[in-house]
Design a protein with these regions (language model features):
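Extreme N-terminal starter segment of soluble prokaryotic enzymes
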Residues: 1-5
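Short, well-formed alpha-helical segments that are part of the catalytic scaffolds
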Residues: 8, 12-27
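Short beta-strand/loop segment that forms part of the nucleotide-sugar
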Residues: 8-9, 29-37, 63, 93
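Acidic helix N-cap motif at the loop->helix transition within catalytic regions
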Residues: 18-19, 40-49, 100-101
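A conserved acidic beta->alpha catalytic loop
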Residues: 23, 35-45, 67, 92
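Conserved donor nucleotide-binding strand/loop of the catalytic core
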Residues: 43-80, 84
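Catalytic-site signature of metal-activated, phosphate-bearing donor transferases
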Residues: 71-78, 85-91, 97-152
Length: 152
């Protein structure tokens, strides 16, 4: 398991969150959910997911913070949730990583040495179950993995 915390911002993401978290199963040591006071079953799902993750040596911590903006919410999560892993990753609850990327993260991230402090990923955008390969949608390059304490 990689020394990685995945930070996920939520607001009524009960229908998406499980798939996102499960795409990291066995890869991420910790998940931090920063919720904007959901009114669906997001909080209850987080408790359930934490129980499942603890059985494989991972954990999911649920926090709530009032929404101001995306950047403020992410920065609040990075600064107030005691992240102590070497690496952090930002995800949206409606995103998931593919199995080959999960394997690559698990195998390669522990070997990334300083001065590298961030990893850029090529995101695939899907619409109605189909990968949008053209029209400027791929590759969409995003800095998503970063050394903890080196971004905010």
């Amino acid at each position: 398991m990689t020394d990685l915390t995945v930070v996920i911002l939520t607001k009524n993401e009960e229908k998406n969150l499980r798939k996102c978290v499960e795409s990291f199963r066995g890869v991420a040591k910790r998940f931090v959910i920063v919720d904007s006071f959901s009114t669906d079953g997001t909080e209850e799902l987080c408790k359930e997911l934490n129980s499942e993750l603890q059985s494989i040596g991972s954990s999911l911590d649920f926090y709530q913070n009032k929404w101001i903006s995306y950047a403020d919410q992410l920065n609040w999560g990075l600064q107030n949730t005691c992240i102590d892993t070497e690496w952090s990753m930002r995800m949206d609850a409606d995103e998931e990583i593919m199995e080959d990327l999960a394997t690559e993260i698990d195998e390669k991230l522990p070997n990334v040495k300083a001065p590298v402090n961030g990893i850029i990923l090529r995101r695939r955008v899907y619409f109605m179950g189909r990968w949008i390969k053209h029209g400027g949608r791929y590759p969409e390059l995003l800095l998503r993995i970063f050394r903890t304490g080196k971004a905010s």
